[in-house]
Design a protein with these regions (language model features):
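Coiled-coil termination/hinge junctions
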Residues: 1-24
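P-loop NTPase catalytic phosphate-binding loop
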Residues: 19-177
Length: 177
């Protein structure tokens, strides 16, 4: 009987909401012997509202791979129409999200210009405000409950921000908060 962690280590299948984000090494010296223990680091997507992946120039490519893996897994595990993704990338020429460029704009958007970023965040803030008002006026406690009660279900929105604060002006930073 194979556990979840065994299947991950064997590079087999794993839940779409669990994504490996890197490896961590621990080095010890015990009785004159140098020992290195390496462990994989995972993030559970379903239990996080915000995830920050910091990188430097040496790790930028790996960080982009992690972001693409996270977005790809979220999209693959969602039914059509239940997830919208926006990639805010003022330096879009770095090819971070090329793999997703073929998707319909209603599913995946790439925003690079400061005015487009501000407009998108303004629209999302107003839209979220309307949903919250509906939640407060109704007997539902969460977006999940809201979607269960509605015929036209509200999709989940994921906003990926690359190279923050590049491309953001003071108004878009305020909207993001």
């Amino acid at each position: 009987d194979m556990s979840l962690w065994d299947s991950i280590d064997d590079k087999g299948t794993m839940p779409s909401s669990l994504v490996m984000v890197g490896k961590k090494e621990h080095r010890f010296a015990i009785l004159g012997e140098n020992i290195t223990i390496s462990e994989n680091c995972y993030v559970e997507l379903l239990n996080n509202q915000n995830l920050i992946i910091r990188h430097n120039n040496n790790t930028k490519q790996k960080a982009h791979q992690v972001v693409n893996s996270l977005v790809g897994r979220l999209m693959a595990s969602s039914s059509p129409g239940k997830l919208n993704v926006a990639m805010i990338d003022a330096e879009e020429m770095d090819g971070t999200c090329d793999v997703f460029k073929f998707l319909n704009r209603n599913i995946f958007q790439i925003l690079a210009r400061p005015e487009d970023i501000r407009k998108y965040l303004d629209e999302k803030e107003r839209h979220i405000g309307n949903i919250i008002q509906n939640l407060l006026l109704g007997s539902v406690k969460s977006l999940y409950d809201y979607n269960q009660a509605k015929e036209n279900k509200e999709p989940y929105h994921v906003i990926v921000i690359e190279d923050f604060p590049i491309g953001f002006n003071s108004e878009s930073i305020s909207l993001l908060q």
